[in-house]
Amino acid sequence: MRQTWVAACVAIVCLIGCRPAEVDHSQQPSATGPAATGPAATEKKAEALEQNAAAAGNKAPPSPSEMINKPEAQAVDPAGAEPLDDAITCLARTIYWEARGEATVDMEAIANVVMNRLGHEGFPNTICDVVRQGHEQGSCQFSWWCDGRSDQAKEDESYATAKEIARKALNLQLTDRTGGALYFHQRRATPGWAAEYAKTVQIGEFLFYKPRGGEAR
């Protein structure tokens, strides 16, 4: 009897103490690896948003997970000196150099023109190419790209505003204040081409236009 009782006790102890340790899966790395973070990941997001915005007739905003948030946008090109090779940087620098020192609504209107051109017939399908268009002939659509000066942003606050506007534009969260304009000039300028286009609106120091027949030239 005593031997039977001892054997039973040993069996119970083994059942309790010999169980394999449970794995805490919450501490294990994901099978797909950690989520990508940092400016490079944000630039990839921006590329996808750019393609979405360039799609003809696509006005539907992306899902929240696809959108760029404020910290992500500000982490890209923090010193305003990175190469112009991604959508956020190209758009933000254009906003900055075309309208720095002007009101926020003026800066937003410049972003509107870039986004209106994106994917429009007669214009490229990426923001950087939209901004650079014409530089091969020395006649850039956006003058800052061809002026021969440094492209580095020098005013932190103004450039931070430009990046925030670029973020909203890529997220399709920016109201088009220009009435679909594809062209603009400063109010004090009198370019010869202006008479060929229909003026849509004046915003601050800028006048905005679009083709009378709807086609870009």
Model-derived regions: residue spans:
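A general, composition-driven signal for non-globular sequence regions
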Residues: 13, 38-39, 94
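Enrichment for repetitive, rod-forming helical segments
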Residues: 9-10, 26, 51-52, 124
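Sec-dependent N-terminal signal peptides
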Residues: 1-23
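N-terminal propeptides/low-complexity segments immediately following signal peptides
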Residues: 24-45
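Long Lys/Arg-rich low-complexity intrinsically disordered regions in nucleic-acid-associated proteins
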Residues: 43-54
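Bacterial extracytoplasmic/cell-wall-associated proteins, especially those involved in peptidoglycan
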Residues: 22, 54, 59, 64-217
